[in-house]
């Protein structure tokens, strides 16, 4: 099974890169995780945020692989406990499907990207900075894997 994280934003701070890399290297070999970074659309004081989000959404839709199940990370999505995420992960593994997780930019996900998602998942009711979401997401995926493997990390 393959998980692709499709995220708006490149040139993350070093602490984000290090945090993400730490958990990505811990992932089990049978669960390949790939980060796909998309450029942030130009924004200025007078720019049209909706246009920027639309451009990011188009790039995101183009990056989604054929046959991938699409999960959008959105504050209005359904919250899962870590145990529920582990159950979902086990279900996805059993189905043999590949899937992608969408992380929006500073203004969130474009409506077109949200519409493409079969699942909308909320990591938290809090508004989180998109760089931090990368670390939270990969850590929760790793934690879910440890639950499935009865590894003591989750205890």
From Swiss-Prot:
Keywords: Cytoplasm, Methyltransferase, rRNA processing, S-adenosyl-L-methionine, Transferase. It is found in: Cytoplasm. It catalyses: pseudouridine(1915) in 23S rRNA + S-adenosyl-L-methionine = N(3)-methylpseudouridine(1915) in 23S rRNA + S-adenosyl-L-homocysteine + H(+). It holds the Pfam family SPOUT_MTase. It comes from the Bacteria. S-adenosyl-L-methionine binds at residues 73, 104, 123-128. One of its GO terms (molecular function) is rRNA (pseudouridine-N3-)-methyltransferase activity. Its main location: cytoplasm. Its EC number is 2.1.1.177. InterPro entries: Alpha/beta_knot_MTases, RlmH-like, tRNA_m1G_MTases_N. Specifically methylates the pseudouridine at position 1915 (m3Psi1915) in 23S rRNA. PANTHER family: METHYLTRANSFERASE, RIBOSOMAL RNA LARGE SUBUNIT METHYLTRANSFERASE H. Belongs to the RNA methyltransferase RlmH family. Homodimer. This is Ribosomal RNA large subunit methyltransferase H. It comes from Cellvibrio japonicus (strain Ueda107). The lineage of its organism: Bacteria, Pseudomonadati, Pseudomonadota, Gammaproteobacteria, Cellvibrionales. The gene is rlmH.
């Amino acid at each position: 099974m393959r998980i692709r994280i499709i995220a708006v934003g490149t040139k993350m701070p070093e602490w984000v890169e290090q945090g993400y890399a730490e958990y990505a290297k811990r992932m089990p070999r049978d669960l390949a995780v790939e980060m796909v970074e998309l450029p942030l659309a130009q924004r200025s004081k007078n720019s049209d945020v909706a246009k920027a989000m639309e451009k990011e959404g188009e790039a995101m839709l183009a990056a989604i692989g054929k046959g991938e199940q699409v999960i959008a990370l959105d504050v209005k999505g359904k919250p899962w406990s870590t145990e529920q995420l582990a159950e979902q992960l086990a279900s996805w593994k059993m189905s043999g499907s590949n899937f992608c997780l969408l992380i929006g930019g500073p203004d969130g996900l474009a409506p077109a990207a949200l519409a493409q998602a079969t699942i909308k998942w909320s990591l938290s009711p809090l508004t989180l900075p998109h760089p931090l979401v990368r670390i939270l997401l990969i850590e929760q995926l790793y934690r879910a894997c440890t639950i499935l493997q009865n590894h003591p990390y989750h205890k």
